[in-house]
């Protein structure tokens, strides 16, 4: 196993709360905001069923944003020289999606459909290790992109 890249991101939760509560959770404005960085799988997992968001839903959205920002930084470390990565919006909404493991730990997965792009072939044998932590006001995400070729 070798480390290909590392990334970190910090989100100020009150700022994310202000951004997300500008719109009713079921509105087109809200959908427009989250569709810029959330994979369809994540939007389904979010489970918006009313006009307002719970504190847990806001943390979920903030955590998703932070994980993807951290992952983008790791990807830029890992991309082979002269490789032009797809735009960030493609990476956020098509390539990466967040799921929880059975123990509740978040994981970032690579969408196999998006991995068909030539410039993403270097990720075919890679995976992200991820962690989130938060307190009342801040949420931090760390990601490590590893090569799984030689994993036992």
UniProtKB/Swiss-Prot annotation:
One of its GO terms (molecular function) is magnesium ion binding. SUPFAM superfamilies: 4'-phosphopantetheinyl transferase. GO terms for cellular component: mitochondrion. It is found in: Mitochondrion. The keyword Lipid metabolism applies. It catalyses: apo-[ACP] + CoA = holo-[ACP] + adenosine 3',5'-bisphosphate + H(+). Pfam families: ACPS. GO terms for biological process: fatty acid biosynthetic process; holo-[acyl-carrier-protein] biosynthetic process. It is an enzyme of class 2 (transferase). Keywords: Fatty acid biosynthesis, Fatty acid metabolism, Lipid biosynthesis, Lipid metabolism, Mitochondrion, Transferase. InterPro entries: 4-PPantetheinyl_Trfase_dom (IPR008278), 4-PPantetheinyl_Trfase_dom_sf (IPR037143), PPTase_2 (IPR016614). The keyword Lipid metabolism applies. Its EC number is 2.7.8.7. Gene3D superfamilies: 4'-phosphopantetheinyl transferase domain. Transfers the 4'-phosphopantetheine moiety from coenzyme A to a Ser of mitochondrial acyl-carrier-protein. Belongs to the P-Pant transferase superfamily. AcpS family. This is Mitochondrial holo-[acyl-carrier-protein] synthase. It comes from Candida glabrata (strain ATCC 2001 / BCRC 20586 / JCM 3761 / NBRC 0622 / NRRL Y-65 / CBS 138). The gene is PPT2.
């Amino acid at each position: 196993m070798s480390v290909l890249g590392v990334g970190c991101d910090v989100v100020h939760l009150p700022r994310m709360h202000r951004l997300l509560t500008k719109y009713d959770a079921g509105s087109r404005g809200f959908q427009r905001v989250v569709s810029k960085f959330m994979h369809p799988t994540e939007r389904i997992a979010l489970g918006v069923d009313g006009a307002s968001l719970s504190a847990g839903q806001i943390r979920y959205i903030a955590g998703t944003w932070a994980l993807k920002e951290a992952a983008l930084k790791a990807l830029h470390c890992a991309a082979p020289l002269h490789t032009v990565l797809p735009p960030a919006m493609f990476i956020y909404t098509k390539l990466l999606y967040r799921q929880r493991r059975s123990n509740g730990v978040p994981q970032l997965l690579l969408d196999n459909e998006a991995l068909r792009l030539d410039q993403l072939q270097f990720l075919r044998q890679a995976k992200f290790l991820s962690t989130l932590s938060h307190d009342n006001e801040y949420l931090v995400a760390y990601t490590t992109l590893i090569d799984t070729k030689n994993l036992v």
